[in-house]
Structure formats: structure tokens, C-alpha cells
Amino acid sequence: MHYEIKKISGIDCLFAPMQEGNSITIDISIKAWSIYEKPEEAGISHFLEHMFFKGGKKRKTPQEVAIAMDKIGAYFNASTWKESTSYYVKCAPQFAFNGLEMLADMLMDATFQPEELEREKGVVIQELKMYEDSPQQLLRKKRSTFFLWDNAYGK
């Protein structure tokens, strides 16, 4: 795959065109996750990943965000890893600006409503319990702790 890295407004941007595709994916990855968290901050990056989808200045509720994405046929989600958190939207090329604008609104102008903060705490706790019930996830955590116990990757 051919790709190109450009610096735009001080931000490293990776462009990987795939001519055969009928959609684009805009992925914004942020250097935020467990290896950067202090013990008293454990889990904050994961929690914020959930909260950023709750609304911004232009779309103030999760429903408004979902409706706006649906109007352009976009799929949006986020994922967290040891080194980064990624927020992404996949849509038709003609809606690229719309998708980027929506991600920017959620990430740069996020609004954290108190009722959403409380509700999302429960969602994140349930997600963590789900991982605890997964033998594969449990094995992965035990393996990381065993082999990487003395550094941030062992968290």
C-alpha cells in the first residue's frame, strides 16, 4: 500500500489512498491511554473515549451526533490501545468534510453533561466486567502483567 505522511498545521497526517474503495476512513489517533496514565488516573482515557461521543458544540446530545452521522451514511466508533486512542468515521468520499467536521466538534468542543457522565460510568464498568469474563482477554492481561510487569505495558 502506498502512503504519504504530511504535516498539516503541526499535525502529522497519514494519507493512504486505496483507489478501489468506495468509502474513506478518517481516523484521529491521540497519544492517550494506559501507558501514559498515572495510577490515580487509571482508566481516564478509556472513559473519555466514551464521553467524546456524547456531543459537542454543534450536536449537543448523543442522539444528535447519531442522526448527523446517519444522514451521511457514516459509521463512527473509537478504540483504545496501550499507546493511543483512535476516533474514526467511515463515509462516502463526498461526505469527507462532514465526517471530519463532526469528529472535530466532538473532540475539540466536547460537552460533558453531568447525567451523561453518570450514565457512562455504568457503561464503562459493564464493559470492564465483560473483559473479565472473557478467557482471551484475561489471558492477554495475565501475559502482559507477567512479561511486562515492570513497565507501563504491563498495566
Language-model-detected regions and their locations in the chain:
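M16/MPP (pitrilysin/insulinase) zinc-metallopeptidase core fold and M16-derived inactive scaffolds
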Residues: 20, 27-90, 133
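M16/insulysin-pitrilysin zinc metalloprotease superfamily fold
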Residues: 90-123
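Sec/Tat-exported extracytoplasmic proteins
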Residues: 52-56, 107, 111, 128, ...
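Scaffold signal of the M16-like zinc-metallopeptidase fold and its non-catalytic homologs
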Residues: 131-155
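N- or domain-start disorder-to-order transition segments that initiate the globular core
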Residues: 1-23
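Short, glycine/charge-rich beta-strand/loop segments that flank catalytic centers
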Residues: 80-89, 114-126, 130, 141, ...
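Short beta-strand/turn micro-motifs at beta-sheet edges
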Residues: 13-17, 74-78, 143
